[in-house]
Amino acid sequence: MSTHREPHDRSTHSRGGTSRRSLLAGAGMLAATVPLAGAVDGLAVTPGRLTTSDHAVPGRAATPAARLRVVQVSDLHLKRIGGLQRRLLERIHESAADLILFTGDLVDSRAHLWQLEQFLRECPRQPRSFAILGNWERWAGIPLEALVRLYERHGVELLVNRSVEFEKDGARIRVTGLDDLVSGRPDVAAALDGMAPTPNHLLLAHCPAARDSLALPAEHPVDLMLSGHTHGGQIAPFGQALVLPHGSGRYVAGWYRDGGPPLYVCRGIGTSLVPVRIGATPELARFEWSLA
């Protein structure tokens, strides 16, 4: 169970994904909404605020073999290192995580790669840090090799349809990172090719709709799936997302445990298309995972 309940922390949502054209149409709704912002909490304009959510993730064993502290950073859409990004860096350092995960859309332009370089330089350097691609890295035309090298310089491993295994206090852990559902070609079979079953399996997919559209092999059950992409709707007065990007599926934010592996959808940090968040405060997600 989570120790911090998010506004969208529920098991089902009826909203489907939309295209970039629909996103722009939704941004137009902002003109009518923003003048009311701040009048009530549900309409608070919150692009510069930051919340931290903490979650306990149960494992397969009644008695955990070890515990893993995980931090998820998603959807930075990094354009500068300002006050929000400084607060985020402080909280990442304070978290003393065993594992830092970057779940896509860290930048949306080649012009901002140097800000990403600076941000990663100031992040704590952990023995294990992983990143996956989002839709914006591909839409921006950033060469994959350039991203791989940039991440490597700061101790982060980019996973594109690939799995990596490591140990924590004798417990074996697998992290599987998929290509983006919207802009790439996620391939679960390729990511798990030649892998033996493991008692602790973490799946990273930028778009949460991957949970419903990809076949996960029964011999490789997933204990925790982490996604971003939705921004919690970004413009979500009173907690109701007006528009969701294609690839969101039925997911907005928070926990989903029905009909698949336990999924957490992080609201992320930045914004896209319009530099405003309403009712969808930026989020750093932290997990304490009980390992089998």
Task: Locate each region found by the language model.
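Beta-strand-turn-beta hairpins that frame and shape the catalytic cleft
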Residues: 58-71, 164-175, 257-262
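Membrane-embedded segments
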Residues: 69-149, 154-157
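N-terminal export leaders
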Residues: 18-32
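Active-site neighborhood of phospho(di)ester-bond hydrolases with catalytic His/Asp-centered motifs
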Residues: 73-74, 100-104, 129-135, 159-161, ...
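Binuclear metal-dependent hydrolase catalytic cores centered on His/Asp/Glu-rich metal-binding motifs
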Residues: 141-156, 162, 168-213, 277-278
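Conserved beta-sheet core of the metallophosphoesterase superfamily
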Residues: 208-288
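C-terminal segment of N-terminal export signals and the immediately downstream linker at the start
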Residues: 18, 36-71, 79, 83, ...
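N-terminal secretory signal peptides
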Residues: 1-18
